[in-house]
Amino acid sequence: MTDSGDLCPHLDSIGEVTKEELIQKSKGTCQSCGVGGPNLWACLQCDCPYVGCGESYSDHSTIHAQAKKHNLTVNLTTFRVWCYVCEREVFLEPKPVTPVSSAHRCKPHDQDPVSQTTCYPLKAVPIAVADEEGSESEEDELKPRGLTGMKNIGNSCYMNAALQALSNCPPLTQFFQDCSGLVRTDKKPALCKSYQKLISELWHKKRPSYVVPTTLFHGIKLVNPMFRGYAQQDTQEFLRCLMDQLHEELKEPLFDCSGGISEVEPDLSLDSCNLVDGDRSPSEDEFLSCDSGSGSERGDGERAGGEAELLIQDECVAVRGTGGISEKERLKERRGEERTREMDEDADVDTAAQDGQAERETETATPATAVPAPGNTEPDNEASMHCPSSRPCSPAHSVQELHSRLSSNPPRSSPLRTGPTYTFKKAQMLLSTKKKKQSRFRSVISDIFDGSILSLVQCLTCDRVSTTVETFQDLSLPIPGKEDLAKLHSSIHQSAPVKAGVCTDGYAAQGWISYIMDSIRRFVVSCIPSWFWGPMVTLEDCLAAFFAADELKGDNMYSCERCKKLRNGVKYCKVLRLPEILCIHLKRFRHEVMYSFKINSHVSFPLEGLDLKPFLAKESPSQITTYDLLSVICHHGTAGSGHYIAYCQNVINGQWYEFDDQYVTEVHETVVQNAEAYVLFYRKSSEESVRERQRVVALANLKEPSLLQFYISREWLNKFNTFTEPGPITNHTFLCQHGGIPPTKYHYVDDLVVILPQNVWEYLYNRFGGGPAVNHLYVCAICQVEIETLAKRRKLEIDTFIKLNKEFQAEEAPTVILCISMQWFREWENFVKGKDNEPPGPIDNSKIAVMKGGHIQLKQGADYGQISEETWQYLLSIYGGGPEIAVRQTISPPDTDTHGERKIEAETRAL
């Protein structure tokens, strides 16, 4: 409860006012300028009926208060009370809030945090680093934060709902709050900085009523032109684009156990359990491969006065911000403030991998996509019709090589494709020795959201099994119909796999008449409530449909390498590694040739205890398989128009809230369970991880004197605080491969490390392994020399190129002009300008060359540049490669025709 000393002394000036009166006033306008709501302010002075606008307009409420000496005012949207004299929010009636069956407007000041925590305990409340400054009382910390709305800035509800759902994912939010020193990038538009600022505003202790995410909105438009303008977009496509860009800006090279930078491994085997993570960098191709590993994710703690101290507490106090916005609070601020790879010797991959390997290795930026259901490759929403994108690879870690894995991109279907058409060919990607060395990368995004699926295709003639591992960031699940449910339930009872193309037969090839009739039937059915025409569909049914076996026959026959011809086959998949946060996307949108429609079937989903063990591969290293719901995004409307909202569970008090743009409303959990889910976020749950953190807290509180103090990665410690499976300690977030501090990180190393007492370090090291142990921080001299050498090399190469190119431009008629691939040249340019730390591989002109008549010629429409012969020879001497392609060559002068001269001379002699 609020201490008596904290009560505002001006509360006596309030007259009698009821909630009904305030609601009635909220429907009015400002009495000075006539502007309407939201966020009008009503004067609470006795017998004063004044209603004025807030700071978002002319702030007539403040002008009225200063002129009339009226101290208290209430926001008619959030019902929060502000005192102008005390310059702070005040609380009228602190009392517990009991669960209600209907939604009511959220009033954080009316909630007793103690009773809330008691009545609604979280299943897994992680421990987080405490606020060292102690600026907030324990009671204030337990009051819910994060209940801040977002203003709709032009059909932006799809963005607002997605951001609110992400904001209520504690591992991600706490990273941006507590590991702000790691949010550094020189990549435009620096979306991670915009997102970090937004998170700090949403979770600020001053609890603003709403914010305007303008900066992030502009940034996402720069990343993907699809979001420009003010048309309604798909929230799932926005999520993929945002998270992919955050990964690109925050990714770091992954170090292997020996301390070196981990690179692409050409020979990997599933049997050895040496599964390697994929780099999440995106690609334009369908089934491309890349590698990445996992690393540590977050750390926390502070260094203060040289004392070794580990401050940890419940997660409910972990989410805090550094900047404030909103209306009356500003008065107070004026005073202060994956590689797809063969897993057996005969493993196959999609032929798209051959053409796309170079693009994957240069990490072209494209939004990520979800793993498609084996039996359903139809586009699932509007955005997928316009912006087909590929799946990036990503990492994960564990003590027994838990974090190693193969990864690849799943096939992305054509909009008019009615079934999976897989064309497999022998993998060739790793056979070329001329490729640039590729480091593997990880980021907080890949650590939290990336999982992997083991896909197997079996030839039914020779029984050969081809195995691949696909990295996913979200699972796009089909919604089975009545017939599909019958097949699924039948297969469950019979303990046999479904081989009938679950959820796809209804969309298979058919005649025009039957196609039109079936389309009309499905359109009519989609307009009827699901309870009228179909059985209850559960999320487990959707998962079963996704993982059901799919026959490859007819037009979708499997090209078997052993048989050397098309054969009937069967494809099925299992989860190889579960992500910390599982994002599930229900495919509610269908796009036919002539129209689009939405599947309005209600899909029931559990708030707690979603178990994925039935869908886990036997090779999976994942130990924890149960999930609890964090947030759910809902779409109301049709395929052509509608509105997005989000339901999220507040991590502080365990209550559920509806986020509808700038309005935040507390709701009962039954409202959430009855929602028409579109995107769901589930988090791994484990009581053991909570007890693990409690043991560390107890060790830290012992304050045993120790002769040695250990530095640990702030990122990994934060990961320990928020993950159920944090993996081995990884101190290479602040160490180089030589064991020192990279010169580029030394000036902000305090933001990257936390000092632990010896007993805490020993417990964590014995429990999780990893390392290395660090007792002293020093700048790495080897890295310093390498940086200086690299700088000299860059300067020499760019100066020489500029000199040779000037000479080339000065030539009026150069005898020889050679071509160079602009793709390779851009890589080289990024290297010499310092944008890329790794030099490019050998010159690769293969994509701009074509063989004609036994001679290499320039391919028509190729992306190339023209350079002089001297420039070509200079670059060739450094990087090698080829082939040489000339657009103008030296023409030898023709032999002089002396026959005519001799004839004239002979005739002259004859005369």
Curated annotation (Swiss-Prot):
Ranges of biased composition (kind: Basic and acidic residues): 297-306, 327-342
Name of a matching Pfam family: UCH
Domain USP: from-to ranges: 148-685
Keyword annotations of the record: Cytoplasm, Cytoskeleton, Endocytosis, Hydrolase, Metal-binding, Protease, Repeat, Thiol protease, Ubl conjugation pathway, Zinc, Zinc-finger
GO CC terms of this entry: centrosome; perinuclear region of cytoplasm
Binding positions for Zn(2+) 1 per the UniProt entry: C8, H10, C83, C86
Predominant place of localization: cytoplasm
Subcellular location per the Swiss-Prot or TrEMBL entry: Cytoplasm, Perinuclear region; Cytoplasm, Cytoskeleton, Microtubule organizing center, Centrosome
Positions of the UniProt region annotated as Disordered: 279-309, 327-420
Free-text function comment from the UniProt entry: Deubiquitinating enzyme involved in beta-2 adrenergic receptor (adrb2) recycling. Acts as a regulator of G-protein coupled receptor (GPCR) signaling by mediating the deubiquitination beta-2 adrenergic receptor (adrb2). Plays a central role in adrb2 recycling and resensitization after prolonged agonist stimulation by constitutively binding adrb2, mediating deubiquitination of adrb2 and inhibiting lysosomal trafficking of adrb2. Mediates deubiquitination of both 'Lys-48'- and 'Lys-63'-linked polyubiquitin chains.
Protein name according to UniProt: Ubiquitin carboxyl-terminal hydrolase 20
Organism: Danio rerio (Zebrafish)
Gene this chain is encoded by: usp20
